[in-house]
């Protein structure tokens, strides 16, 4: 059973879709906001091992042309903005291409910030896999990166085109991250 919530922000409005199995059918989840073209997936090593093949297979099977950047997991990754920009440049992304963030809040923040600022803004879709990202960071429109001087010192307000939440991803979440999301 699917639940759909609409975030009404005028021109920046978007839907949040919540349904078991969305990770296996992510292509159909993005189709309403991005019917065709290239999709650049930003994820981390842990999430990629769990869901990367499933998401890439869904995108390829639906005719999208996906690329992927896999980063180390953890908060320190939010300092990797230059690496994301270089990967986007190497992929020759244009303003018509979509960025898809697949992971927890760190990946959503970093990938969303890169989408907001690369070529002055690429469309992006959040696919959060942690409880905290599903209930908080993926739906607030705040994206940012860290500096050595502190967390989230550089950022933007940039709304996703959609948020796709598969509650089944919580089954692979370590207990401490589940507790973080409940707090």
Q: Where in this protein do the model-derived segments appear?
A:
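Residue-level "edge-of-site" marker
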Residues: 72, 101, 130
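A glycine/threonine-rich phosphate-anchoring loop and its flanking beta-alpha core
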Residues: 113-183
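Catalytic nucleophile loop
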Residues: 108
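Acidic-aromatic/histidine active-site loop/patch
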Residues: 105
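ATP/NTP phosphate-donor binding region
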Residues: 1-98
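Short, basic, helix/turn surface patches
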Residues: 91-102, 151-157
């Amino acid at each position: 059973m699917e639940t759909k919530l609409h975030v009404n922000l005028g021109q920046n409005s978007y839907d949040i879709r919540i349904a078991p199995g969305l990770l296996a059918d992510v292509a159909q989840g993005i189709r309403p906001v991005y019917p065709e073209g290239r999709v650049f997936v930003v994820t981390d090593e842990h999430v990629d091992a769990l869901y990367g093949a499933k998401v890439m297979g869904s995108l390829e099977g639906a005719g999208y042309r996906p690329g992927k950047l896999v980063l180390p997991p953890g908060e320190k990754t939010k300092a990797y903005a230059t690496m994301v920009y270089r990967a986007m440049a190497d992929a020759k992304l244009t303003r018509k291409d979509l960025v898809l963030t697949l992971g927890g809040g760190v990946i959503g923040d970093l990938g969303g910030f890169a989408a907001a600022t690369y070529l002055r803004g690429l469309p992006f879709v959040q696919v959060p896999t942690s409880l905290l990202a599903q209930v908080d960071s993926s739906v607030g429109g705040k994206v940012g990166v860290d500096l050595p001087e502190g967390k989230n010192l550089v950022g933007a307000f940039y709304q996703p085109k959609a948020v796709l939440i598969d509650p089944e991803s919580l089954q692979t979440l370590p207990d401490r991250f589940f507790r973080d999301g409940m707090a």
